[in-house]
């Protein structure tokens, strides 16, 4: 995540291939073509979060709740990347649901106006538009099966091209496959960001001629 932020914002956010290299939410201003926006780099998501990192994780949750667009970065070179993807989605849903339930139980919490004028505390993760970025395609490896091999196909037997077709068909959200380190498909990534953010901007400010 931090590598992608550094590349887009031309800043120097600490990036390391280890859990919790980012412990605080970092925000940078990014401009793609003529469109400026704020990009937040948050702490990574894992199952069974260590107690001493709970506060950092709460700050991440705050960023997710207030975001207009969620960028879910997945390390596709990891052998268990599909499980990691599901863990992140499940964790965000659980945390947002729990936080909303707590807030709704507190009568002094100021509620936002939702549909039909009813009180609505926070947006749910399902309402957040998102882009799934499969990173590290340069490190993706697989082992083709022999023609006479009748054993079931495993994850390590699936090529990157097959993986792309599968995930593009599976996800309702936009997804893209890149290598931040090798600068592969970065122009496509920027274009995708630009189009999605521009669409959000137009919906919010329909009479703004800025774009």
Predicted features by range, described:
Residues 65-70, 169-173:
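Short acidic (Asp/Glu) and glycine-rich catalytic loops that position anionic groups and cofactors
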